[in-house]
C-alpha cells in the first residue's frame, strides 16, 4: 500500500512539475546582464556559480543537465537576453561566449590606449605597451589601427602584439616592394607620419603636409608642429599651448626648439599617413595654417604665412 502511495506521489509530482520545467526551458530571459563562468571550475562549481547569478534554480539546472547528458560548462561570458534557458545552457556547454571588440584608432597615443584597455573587458597586462616585443627603440605609434575582437578576460598583450606584428609586416612589405622617395628610414617615416596624422584635417591634405615637413627637413628648418609640443606635455596637457610651452627647451618633443624629428612617434599613424610620408617628396610649401577644422592654407614664404594668420584672426607666436 505504501509503495503504491509513493509511486502515485512521484507520478503526480512529475505531472505537476514537468509543465513548469518545460515553461522555464523555453521562456526567453529578459535579463540584460550576461552570465560569467570563471576558468577552471568543476561542473558542480559552475552550476553553483550560475545559480548564484540568479539565472536558474540549481535543482532544475541539474535536472536539465542530467536529461540532456551535459557534463561540462566552458568558461567565459554568455549572453542570455532574449534566449530560452535551453539555448543558454547549450551555449555554455559548447563555449559560445560573447565576442567583444576594441577599436585601435589612428591618432591614438599610449595614454589614450591605456585608458581604452582599462575601460574594456581585457586584462591589462601590458601597461603603456611595456610588453611588446619590437625592433623599434620606442613604444609609441607601433600599432596597426584596426578593430580587434576578443573574449572577456583575454590578455591585452595578445591583441597588442598582434597589432604591432601587423604594422611591422606592412612596413617590411612597403620597404621591400618599392623605394621611398626620400632619405628617411622606417623609424623616421613612422615618426613623421604620426605628426602628419595629428596635423592633417583630411586625407587629401596628407601629401601636402608631408611635403611641407620634408621640405623643412631638407632645408634644416625646424618642423614647428604644435602636436609635438602637446605630446611632450602629456599626460598633463591642459588643452592650451602657451608661449612658455613653445619656448620650453626641456620638452624633447618640442619641434619649435629641437632640430629634426622628435625621438619617437606621437601617435598611431593611419596607413594613408604612412604612405604620404613614404612616397612623399619635399614640396614647394614651407608653412601651413588651419583655415577650418578640416583644411589648411599652405604658404611658400613666411610673409605670406603671417598674412594668412592675420587674415584668419589667429594668435600665433612669431618665432
Pin down the residues of each PLM region.
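Binding-cleft/active-site segments that stabilize strongly anionic ligands or cofactors
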Residues: 238-269, 274
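Conserved catalytic or metal-liganding residues and their short signature motifs at active sites
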Residues: 1-224, 228-234, 248, 265-272, ...
